């Protein structure tokens, strides 16, 4: 949901709100592509604009508008995949999903991606010949009264692990 491109958050240089800012400072990171962004500051938007294409954002509202205008998710996935290098690290922030799938995440935002929509994108990435070299899942917060967020998170991890193995030709 968030760009996470803040230089610091509440006095912390290394926080959930600054992780992509810190990743952008690593010279070996060729490109950062964010999908489903729907909450970001003017400073973060300026940072994306000033990155000369090194940081690209596929905002949720733009994805939705393209869909409403008749463009398929498959076509949009092709655009997203084209923006990536051959080796891809997937950082899956659970709040990219529709909040009904992760209601206990720290800062839910209306809108978001469907679970299968995310994995259709990752499968398109693999079909293009790109390789997943690693992944993480962040900002999963289990509820006090139910395990819904945990179940969604575990299923995401399971799919990510299997798809990474497929991308590395260790599974079919």
Spans of features found by a protein language model:
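Glycine-rich phosphate/diphosphate-binding loop of Rossmann-like nucleotide-binding domains
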Residues: 38-42, 46-50
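Catalytic cores of soluble, metal-dependent hydrolases
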Residues: 40, 52, 56-172
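Short, conserved catalytic or adaptor-binding loops enriched in Gly and charged residues
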Residues: 23, 47-54
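Short amphipathic alpha-helical segments
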Residues: 9-10, 46, 101-104
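Active-site histidine-anchored catalytic micro-motif
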Residues: 1-34, 131-132, 145
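Cofactor-binding loop segments of dinucleotide-utilizing enzymes, especially the Rossmann-like FAD-
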Residues: 1, 37, 140
């Amino acid at each position: 949901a968030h760009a996470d491109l803040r230089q610091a958050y509440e006095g912390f240089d290394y926080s959930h709100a600054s992780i992509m800012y810190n990743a952008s400072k690593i010279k070996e990171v060729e490109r950062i592509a964010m999908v489903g962004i729907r909450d970001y500051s003017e400073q973060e938007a300026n940072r994306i604009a000033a990155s000369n294409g090194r940081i690209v954002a596929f905002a949720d509202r733009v994805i939705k508008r393209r869909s409403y205008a008749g463009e398929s998710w498959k076509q949009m996935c092709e655009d997203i995949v084209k923006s990536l290098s051959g080796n891809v690290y997937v950082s899956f922030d659970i709040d990219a999903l529709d909040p009904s799938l992760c209601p206990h995440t720290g800062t839910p935002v209306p809108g978001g991606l469907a679970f299968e929509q995310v994995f259709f994108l990752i499968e398109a990435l693999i079909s293009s010949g790109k390789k997943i070299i690693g992944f993480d899942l962040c900002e999963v917060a289990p509820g006090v009264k139910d395990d819904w967020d945990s179940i969604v998170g575990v299923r995401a991890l399971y799919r990510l692990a299997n798809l990474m193995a497929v991308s590395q030709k260790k599974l079919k």
